[in-house]
Swiss-Prot record:
Keywords: 4Fe-4S, ADP-ribosylation, ATP-binding, Iron, Iron-sulfur, Metal-binding, Nitrogen fixation, Nucleotide-binding, Oxidoreductase. It is an enzyme of class 1 (oxidoreductase). This is Nitrogenase iron protein. GO terms for molecular function: 4 iron, 4 sulfur cluster binding; ATP binding; metal ion binding; nitrogenase activity. The gene is nifH. Belongs to the NifH/BchL/ChlL family. Binds 1 [4Fe-4S] cluster per dimer.
Length: 291
């Protein structure tokens, strides 16, 4: 068994991060890789398609029921899913109470101390990325996740979140070994989406790993709580995820320290692509409409 690769999928809420990560990991396990998924999103939906079940009980929830995390056994929190993928969800507190990041820290420490990382090739963290607060940045900050893949699209807020996540990676890149593996663009069919994703990758100094086309088969599979790899293994979309998995597998050691841009530079880039109007153009358009 080679060196353990600790990867993380970050991205803004609703971008399709959990779906993309689970389909990619299902493709990786087909390639003979042994995988542990650590869900770090309070929604606790990072393992649903691999386990083919409703939401998994989280480490924090089980610890609260048992009395403390020390009262848990590894088999209480790790479930086995598609082709032997190990799955666990860190979980988070009740909305409005406490820090969700604390659950991530508690869960990862428990898993490491109890041998969950011992016989796997990949540990994959699925992390909420709108807020790069201390807790959610923990897999980066504590030098756990070494390769970060940002799931984004051509939408303004997805680009903004991707740049913000790159800032978080840069902050910890020198003190730890964390690197940006690259961008994964989940197609939303916005204008000039692939070009825009490639332009942002160039500005961040990283690769555009893969452009995942939009396909309704993803939703059909999700309704059955399955990945596309499991639901429609011969489909074109399954091949896209296999290609993405292959690119990530071959990207070992090729991550970069990102070069995030300012908000002004991001807006300028969007203007260059005609996605966003400058204030002058906006006012001119209003004046023309009123004339």
């Amino acid at each position: 068994m080679g060196k353990l690769r600790q990867i993380a999928f970050y991205g803004k809420g609703g971008i399709g991060k959990s779906t993309t990560s689970q389909n990619t990991l299902a493709a990786l396990v087909e390639m003979g890789q042994k995988i542990l998924i650590v869900g770090c999103d309070p929604k606790a939906d990072s393992t649903r398609l691999i386990l083919n079940t409703k939401l998994q009980d989280t480490v924090l929830h089980l610890a609260a029921e048992a009395g403390s995390v020390e009262d848990l056994e590894l088999e209480d929190v790790v479930k086995i899913g598609y082709k032997g993928i190990k799955c666990t969800e860190a979980g988070g507190p009740e909305p409005g109470v406490g820090c969700a990041g604390r659950g991530v820290i508690t869960a990862i420490n428990f898993l490491e101390e109890n041998g969950a990382y011992d016989d796997v090739d990949y540990v994959s963290y699925d992390v909420l990325g709108d807020v790069v607060c201390g807790g959610f940045a923990m897999p980066i900050r504590e030098n756990k996740a070494q390769e970060i893949y940002i799931v984004m699209s051509g939408e303004m807020m997805a680009l903004y979140a991707a740049n913000n996540i790159a800032k978080g990676i840069l902050k910890y890149a020198n003190s730890g070994g964390v690197r940006l593996g690259g961008l994964i663009c989940n197609e939303r069919k916005t204008d000039r989406e692939l070009e825009l994703a490639e332009a942002l990758a160039a500005r961040l100094g990283c690769k555009m790993i893969h452009f995942v086309p939009r396909d309704n088969i993803v939703q059909h599979a999700e309704l059955r709580r399955e990945t596309v790899i499991q639901y429609a293994p011969e489909s074109k979309q399954a091949q896209e995820y296999r290609e993405l998995a292959r690119k990530i597998h071959e990207n070992s050691g090729k991550g970069v320290i990102p070069t995030p841009i300012t908000m002004e530079e991001l807006e300028e880039m969007l203007m260059d692509f005609g996605i966003m109007q400058s204030e002058e153009d906006r006012l001119a358009a209003i004046a023309a409409a009123e004339a």
